[in-house]
């Protein structure tokens, strides 16, 4: 191997070190930074928070039936009439006008409906709790997408760097092969082999750069801004000791299961509502009205208080059908919960296995790199002594590159698998990850709306926030 080749390699290493030093002043973006940005910038999370607000309002709407209802009405009527009256040929005109104004108040209060209205409120509250769990599920999806985007950009950036380094090495190898050909140490075949390998390296670099550009755009969509200098740790912690512990945590904590548990409760309460449909409803109502003829100053007042009970005798089989339908939906919800538990356990097992595979691949790739590096250095030295051909050097170099690529991919797979295992357990939320983000408390808005039928200041602020996001 020529001295010019070794010198070029050293110059390349020094150049990379200088370039790295120049980038040090730029603050690196960590995975935690990226996750926090994805959480804050996610329109999907904001959308589901709005849906949660809508579900909160359903509780207020249902509770309004337990409160008094007060309505008013008013009207002004102008009447005109004209004609001619008389007899025996004697007639006279008769014209009259009148203006009548009226106003009234009507009040109504539910006295007793055997708990049907209270059940309706409980149904909506359970729906709210289920929607909260759905929001957590969406949050998990947003954050795991951010992990994948961050890790893929790091992986593809390192692969581009490896491809560029490989291109530089093969370029020097080609130059060395030409120098040796000029002095008769190798044949034209050796030069052609190096040229072919150089063309392949350029093609691979172009493909790697294209993959990186795709990863950058996905990062921009998932995180909310273009990637900066990314700084991630190669150390991956195992989020749980063993598979059984992971499954136990997932069954207890996964938001998908909790959401379906609330759905089962909703279905059970809805069945109870349907069973109460035949029960009578008792209401108390009262009204007061005032009517005045403005043209004659005549007036009248009226008022009444009424206690009314109503109930269903026969509706063509509608009520029993509702009961059977609600029972079927309850059964379907229970089966759905069982299926979800099985699916969650399967996802946990799959994620756990993938983490084990990625960990094993990373360890194997490290051994592969050490062996391939020793082989490459040995082949290169032997080639300098004439005991190896250019093809041997190129093949050894390719094996080292493949080993390094395998390690980069294995590290990325291990990182993603670790967080996917967290997600499958239901522990991939901003709160559990300890992200530095504004804490969102769904209970705060719910409490305000539950006791305040009018729009609260919190609701107005959220409306303004959603409008600003819509303008963007």
Q: Which residues does each PLM region occupy?
A:
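Periplasmic alpha-helical coiled-coil/stalk elements that build and connect Gram-negative outer-membrane
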Residues: 1-5, 141-252, 263, 274, ...
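Acidic, low-complexity, intrinsically disordered peripheral segments
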Residues: 3, 409-472
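Bacterial N-terminal signal peptides
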Residues: 11-23
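Sec/Tat signal peptide C-region and signal peptidase I cleavage site
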Residues: 24-28
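A glycine-/polar-enriched beta->alpha junction
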Residues: 36-46, 53-68, 97, 104-123, ...
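Transmembrane beta-strands of outer-membrane beta-barrel pores
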Residues: 76-82, 111, 288-292, 311-313, ...
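Flexible, solvent-exposed loop segments that connect beta-strands
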Residues: 81-96
